[in-house]
Amino acid sequence: MSLWRQTPDLEQLNASQKNSIGDLLGIRFEAFDDESLTASMPVDSRTHQPFGLLHGGASVVLAESLGSMASYLCVDTSQYYCVGLEVNANHLRGLRSGRVTAVARAIHLGRTTHVWDIRLSGDDGKPSCIARLTMAVVPLAGMAGRAG
């Protein structure tokens, strides 16, 4: 049984990245199955740190972008939205080029929080980073009367 409340539409997910950090870094949603969502980004000058390796912060942006979208696809968006509460990452090895691919899998899908395990790897399939993302599931009604 699928965990998705909305069936992922990869074209629509990619279009949603326009004019965001995901667009700037070249993040692309690539695949999904009943239990996971996959995205990738290039390892290039946009995502390098000064020594030519993938910047750890760029890995975290990929992880949080992927996990946030996964949470969004698991809720009734007419009643709820999702925001990040906490993200942590263990950087396992450096990448210099190619693409880094991330796969998000749910650890916990509760009424008010979601927790995601996000595994990043290089083109060779070897792990480069393991991230955990906690998302808050917030009622849209809670937005009424709030100023931006």
Language model region names:
Residues 1-148:
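Terminal targeting signals and extreme-terminal segments of soluble enzymes
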